[in-house]
Structure formats: C-alpha cells, structure tokens
Amino acid sequence: MTRKQRRLLMIGGAGVVLVVAVGLVLNAMRGSIVFFSTPKMVSEQQIGAGTRFRLGGVVEPGSLHRGDQLAVSFKVSDGAATVPVAFKGILPDLFREGQGVIAEGALDTAGVFKADTVLAKHDETYMPKEVADALKKQGHWKDDYEKKPPGAPGASADAAGPSR
C-alpha cells in the first residue's frame, strides 16, 4: 500500500468516525429537543399524539377550572385558535386568566394538551418572540405591548421620571 493510499484510508476512516459520532449525538438529543408552537400552529399542523412541544399563548378568560386535588384545566389562545390544556400540579404564583403562559407537554388522542410543566409570564414586559410574531401576523398586536414601565430594563430615560 502506497503512502497516498494509506493517507486516503485514514481520512476516510476519520470521516466515518465523525459521521457516526454526529449521528449518535443527534439521536441522544432527539428526546430533549422541544419545539415551540402557538395554538394556531397546533390547529394547522398535524401534531401527533405523544409528540412533546411547548405551547405558548394567553390563558383564555373564563376557562380556568380547578378539579380534585391539584388538577387544573384551562384553554390557551393566541387570538386565532384555542387549545384545551390539562395540568396536575402546583401552578406558578403569577398564573392567572388573561396572562401569558408557556406549557410543556404533549397532545393526547382527544386533542387535549397534557402539560407536565407550566410557566407563567414573569413580568408585564415579557412575551416570547414567537407569540409576539404570531400576534403581529394575525393583526392582534397592540402597540402598548412594547411599552416598558418606568425603571424597567431598556426603558427610556424620559419614561423613568425625574432623577433624584
């Protein structure tokens, strides 16, 4: 075997090892990757039962129902579509109707989103980029969503009021 053939064999072997390593990493990450969807995206796409994703939107007013023990059901809306959500656990303190929420879980066969994690909007200026984009696209965006309260990070000096 010539020197050139050995070099090509080494490069080919290294390429095979690299492809196998990338394949193993992607296979291991498949279970931990969670995609974000809005209710409209869920209704338009055929997301199969059992597929994990994050559902983001606003808790629809009047939809919150507390059941036995820690069972809670509510609806998440983005203004264009609504998805029913079932959750068993302790809700965040800031969770309420009309507020932003992100729930992580999967759809069941009846089309109910079974959440195992619920995150509430943590301040009045936070809105996930995907939810903001969806609201803008559907024409439900309000300009006051972008206004920051005085003293908030990124608020203008004029909005902060007089300094001491």
From Swiss-Prot:
UniProt keyword terms in alphabetical order: Cell inner membrane, Cell membrane, Cytochrome c-type biogenesis, Heme, Iron, Membrane, Metal-binding, Signal-anchor, Transmembrane, Transmembrane helix
Gene Ontology MF term list: heme binding; metal ion binding
Location relative to the cell: Cell inner membrane
Biased composition (Basic and acidic residues): 137-149
Membrane-spanning intervals of the chain: 8-28
Start-end of Low complexity biased regions: 153-164
Periplasmic topological segments: 29-164
Cellular component aspect of the GO annotation: plasma membrane
Membrane-related topology note: Single-pass type II membrane protein
BP-aspect Gene Ontology terms: cytochrome complex assembly
InterPro entries: CcmE, CcmE-like_sf, NA-bd_OB-fold
Any single Pfam family the record assigns to this protein: CcmE
Domain of life according to the entry: Bacteria
Residues in compartment: Cytoplasmic: 1-7
Residues covered by region (Disordered): 137-164
Binding site for heme: H122, Y126
Its biological purpose: Heme chaperone required for the biogenesis of c-type cytochromes. Transiently binds heme delivered by CcmC and transfers the heme to apo-cytochromes in a process facilitated by CcmF and CcmH.
Family to which this protein belongs: Belongs to the CcmE/CycJ family.
PANTHER family linked: CYTOCHROME C-TYPE BIOGENESIS PROTEIN CCME HOMOLOG, MITOCHONDRIAL
Name of the protein in its database record: Cytochrome c-type biogenesis protein CcmE
